[in-house]
Amino acid sequence: MRIAVIKESECEAPENCDYICAEVCPRVREGFKETVYAKPNGKAAITESLCISCGICVKRCPFDAIRIINLPDEMARELTFQYSLNSFRTFNIVTPVSKKILGLIGRNGIGKTTNIRLISGDIKPNFGDFKNPPSNEEIIKKFRGKDIQPYLTSLYLNSVKIALKPQEFRLSGKVKDLVKLDKYGIINKNVMERSSETLSGGEAQMVEIARTLDNDADVYIFDEPMNYLDIKNRLKIAQKIKTALSDKTVIVVEHDLIMLDYLTDFIQILYGSDANYGIVSHLMPSRNGINTYIAGYLPTENVRFRDYEIRIKKAPSSSNEKVIVSWPEFEVDIGEFSLKTSSGSLYGGDIVGVIGENGIGKSTFIRALAGELETKSGRLDLGIKIAYKPQIIEAKDGLVSDALADVDPNYPKKQESLEIINKLGVTKLLNKNVKNLSGGELQKLAIASTLMREADVYLFDEPSANLDIEDRLETMSLISNIMSLKRKCAIVIEHDLMFIDSVCQKSILFSGESGKIGLTDTIMPTSKAINNFLKSVDITMRRDKDSKRPRINQNNSRLDVEQKASGQFFAE
């Protein structure tokens, strides 16, 4: 089976291209003009049945808009949905489990949202026939004998009510008008009186979740519910979903592995080639599913979908060799909010995590270190070079390559810079306009731009936001390696505890009252900081015996009771 994908957003025919793909195609030269041709909108198109997979058009396309992929012929029987000619397609389909929580795991652009749309009835399986899609009866017949058939039968008879929390926020108006009940007490009272336009990302996420939970539905779907939420609220939402929807069918898409593991009963892995095609795996228990994803190999299907196994490592110990920077105790007042910090020092190779809920001064802290905010005693003059990636990233008009050149005009000649942009996947974005980047692509550009700068201290505010699991792990590895090799240091604000655990040798734990006061502890070993945080929220964690990833214990389980009794809330 052959797949030809042309990304119309990147194909610049006919304005800036004379169809070089057609000019170089051997089949076109032989007289089969319809192998590569222009569609009515002027964009290039490929007839897959005539293509011989020579790959010449892929190599010669100046805009990197073409992909030719060969799959086993038997995959044609599993084709479930295709958007249009030469577009993304998905094989197999996500299968909801009655009165259980199903988690979907996979890279961005691999078909998770497409499958959610299929399950919610927003789009319907067409089995590749996008011009003449099948009827409901034909769809149900096609899935005869499969676990998904009864669900789709009920869905198309309108006997299944679905509540969907979308990935993108769709809020407009007063919060109290959007959330009539808030049955589970998710939203703070002060937020209820505000307009949705004034909400932070975390507040908007909580509103969307509350709206979804207020529905009386049969199936609840949550697309990336943990985005923008702090650790405390991630735990709160996971617990609410588990308890409030214990007798409902639930589907969750999430990139935070700790939360996904804690929240779900079953996992389906989506793999393939991002933006080209996605394949849905069989159903697995959550622990097995996540460990299988980490291993990159599906034993039941005998498929290796990644050529390496993800290694979950504990952050290496710090050397405390040479002090790079020290800061005194300081205070920052912004309106009614006040931040009071302890003094601290960073050593060569240090990566220090910042842990705490939203609204208690974490971003204020690193902005003060970066010299963006004045303290009560004036701006801090630390006498060092600082590179800073803010939480909110501005998407300026212009090419990605120009944005990188603004950081360092000579970056194409520097091996270190090229390695950074290659490992983060920014190379394939060079000809894109920054304004057209997705949230994840913009995040990777911002991280690359920060790491390319010559600095003594690197400050990262939520670097994993909008990144999929593999991009998060690549970012962890990259930051860790650069700080270790260059003997520089970094401070990382992060809500993904696996990120903190894997990268940060030390951490600072923030406490206080959101929007009013923030207090910092002294810098301490990360294991101690996580232990203290977990104690404050009455949650225990352990390491998985196979993958070594952190896992949350179920409340009142044997391990949970034993760890709480011993005071070891994070069992190493």
Regions found by a protein language model. Give the residues of each.
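Walker B catalytic motif
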Residues: 224-225, 462-463, 470
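ABC ATPase nucleotide-binding domain signature region
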Residues: 97-103, 107, 113-182, 256-267, ...
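Hydrophobic anchor residue at the start of the ABC signature
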Residues: 209, 237, 447, 475
